Amino acid sequence: GGYETTSDEAKANMFEFKDSLISDWTIYAIAGALGNIANESAFNPWRWQSDTVNYNAGYGLVQFTPASGYINEFTNYANLSTSEITAGARPEDGACQCDVLRNDSMGKWTDRSSYNLWYDLSSFESFSAFKSVNNLYDATMAFLYNYEGNAVVLSRDEARQRADFAIRYASASTCYEIITGEPPGPGPVPSRTIENNLMKKYLKYGFFF
């Protein structure tokens, strides 16, 4: 299982995550990713998707999928447990996951702005743009769509997308306050619309898709 956001275990892992990435990511990028992590692994770097060992499903802080891609390529750890720290699930694995995330070593970042029917994410086509993001709203949204790319994102169901994002943004706001000691502020007014997004794509590609 995972940890409650305000638990000592979750807080300790948040600070480890921040300390690992702060030299390369803005504090907003870090908190935005943490808001998503809260709803993926609940801050447990050794967690398997559905708490069941399955090398074809998700594993780790951000639920690397398939798990075999992360475990076989970036670690030598085997027999990872879903219930306790084993010889293969040690703190070094959590640090390794941060290193993999630092520059998206697994190549998971994908421009999915066309899946968002209500907010323009075209400024975050690249992972480098995400790492330098300057507000929590965009950070949480960009990580959800372009890194996580979960089933809700792929559904193109606006109501579900908005509800899922609201949960993750609330988590990100809590994480930001924990790791900085202050609230994130109101952030940008989400005035960028799908109409603007589609027009940009039309001007760029000459067609809608």
Task: Tell me what each language-model feature is.
Residues V189-F209:
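Enriched but not universal
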Residues I27-G35, N134-M141:
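Alpha-helical scaffolds flanking conserved acidic
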